Design a protein with these regions (language model features):
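A short hydrophobic alpha-helix cap/turn motif
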Residues: 17-18, 60-62, 75, 117
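Residue(s) in the substrate-gating loop at a strand-loop-helix junction
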Residues: 29
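Active-site loop immediately N-terminal to the catalytic Tyr-X3-Lys motif
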Residues: 34-40, 62-63, 101, 119
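Active-site loop-to-helix junction immediately N-terminal to the catalytic Tyr of the SDR YXXXK motif
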Residues: 35-44, 55, 79, 83, ...
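Alpha-helical segment proximal to the catalytic Tyr-Lys
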Residues: 14, 58-62, 122
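C-terminal helical subdomain
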Residues: 3, 69, 89-120, 124, ...
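A glycine/serine/threonine-rich, flexible loop-to-helix segment
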Residues: 62, 73-98, 138-161
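Active-site helix of classical SDR
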Residues: 9, 45, 53
Length: 161
């Protein structure tokens, strides 16, 4: 995964340098910010995306190239929407993890990318914009209690889908 980002930057940067600069937005994940046991490769790669973003911003900022990343939480795309329709209590369980009470949509991500590519963010580089409905800002102690209560109240919840 990091090789793809490296190669993309390697071949894009000469073109961006020859013009008026440009913008690169990498896709990381909240798993690059918070780690979960058993996901060593994925989470190491996403942490690497954040590091690579910062390094590229440092290296190529003087050339007028801004480099940022986004770190999405759970995003409800067509495939996952179909799976969650079969498992509404499981989806509610996941949605309850987010302080705003829902999972993200592709539009949430597109809006973040559009902002990072806009003039409104012209002084932002090397930043990872977390788009996660507040998941990464909450203390986990109360979150665990809330989720346990949900399972008690909804014993038929299927968490394997």
């Amino acid at each position: 995964y990091l090789k793809a980002l490296y190669l993309g930057a390697k071949y894009a940067i000469p073109h961006l340098k020859s013009g008026d600069g440009g913008i690169i937005v990498n896709i990381a994940s909240i798993h690059g910010i918070l780690q979960e046991p058993g996901r060593f490769v994925y989470e190491s790669a996403k942490t690497g995306v954040i590091g690579m973003t910062r390094q590229l911003a440092t290296e190529f900022g003087p050339d007028g190239i801004r480099v940022n990343a986004i770190a999405p939480g759970h995003i409800l795309v067509e495939r996952s929407a179909q799976a969650w329709k079969k498992n509404p209590t499981g989806h509610k369980f996941v949605s309850n993890q987010y302080p705003i009470g829902r999972t993200g949509t592709p539009d949430d991500i597109a809006n973040g990318i559009a902002f990072l590519c806009s003039d409104e963010s012209s002084f932002i580089t090397g930043h990872t914009l977390t788009i996660d409905g507040g998941l990464t800002v909450q203390l986990q102690e109360q979150f665990g209690v809330k989720q346990a209560q949900y399972i008690i109240d909804n014993p038929d919840t299927n968490l394997s889908d």
